[in-house]
């Protein structure tokens, strides 16, 4: 393999990552139903498709940073970013779309709502308080699961389509 072909392959890889970042940032900025975003789908896609471990974690986190710079940051962002990195890690381990989506969404639900319970004064710091927090978050979990499946299949089938046509190989 020549240097030129290796360089071009890396360029395609970077182009795919950049397009993914732009798409994610765009979808987080437009009005959408609560928790109906492509962030976990991007994380699952990056975990399965990007061979470089660090890159598969940096792509979804970078996209979040870009869109959060516009939307605004809050005190619990580090936990959300950690949950996103863990989603990519899960996808790398399972390497199947459906299992990765369900596992990532469940982990994201458990981590982020535990954070809500810990940081919020809305719930008593007791077993009943954490159960109430998780119970009230169930509708959001449904939207997270639905959007992650929806966007995951768009990403994976879009990638399969793009890599199957000759035009992609000339980019």
Where are these regions (language model features)?
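Hydrophobic transmembrane alpha-helices
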Residues: 2-48, 55
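Mature catalytic domains of secreted/periplasmic carbohydrate-active enzymes
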Residues: 3, 11, 49-54, 59-62, ...
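Hydrophobic alpha-helical transmembrane segments
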Residues: 14-19, 54-58, 78-82, 98-103, ...
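Alpha-helical transmembrane segments of multi-pass membrane proteins
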Residues: 20, 40-44, 80-88, 149-152
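Central hydrophobic cores of alpha-helical transmembrane segments
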Residues: 20-21, 56-67, 99-109, 171
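Structural signal for the C-terminal ends of transmembrane alpha-helices
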Residues: 26-27, 46-51, 89-95, 158-166
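Interfacial aromatic-anchored transmembrane helix boundaries in multi-pass membrane proteins
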Residues: 26-37, 61-93
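Membrane-embedded alpha-helical hairpins and interfacial helices in multi-pass inner-membrane proteins
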Residues: 97-171
């Amino acid at each position: 393999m020549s240097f030129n072909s290796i360089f071009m392959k890396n360029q395609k890889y970077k182009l795919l990552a950049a397009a993914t970042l732009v798409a994610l940032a765009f979808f987080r900025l437009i009005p959408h139903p609560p928790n109906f975003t492509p962030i976990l789908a991007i994380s699952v896609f990056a975990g399965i498709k990007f061979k470089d471990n660090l890159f598969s974690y940096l792509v979804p986190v970078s996209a979040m940073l870009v869109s959060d710079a516009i939307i605004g940051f809050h005190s619990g962002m580090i936990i959300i970013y950690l949950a996103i990195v863990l989603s990519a890690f899960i996808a790398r381990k399972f390497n199947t779309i459906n299992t990765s989506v369900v596992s990532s969404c469940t982990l994201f639900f458990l981590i982020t709502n535990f954070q809500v319970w810990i940081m919020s004064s809305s719930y008593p710091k007791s077993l009943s308080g954490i159960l109430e927090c998780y119970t009230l978050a169930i509708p959001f979990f449904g939207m997270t699961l639905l959007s992650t499946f929806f966007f995951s299949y768009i990403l994976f089938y879009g990638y399969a389509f793009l890599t199957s046509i000759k035009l992609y190989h000339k980019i």
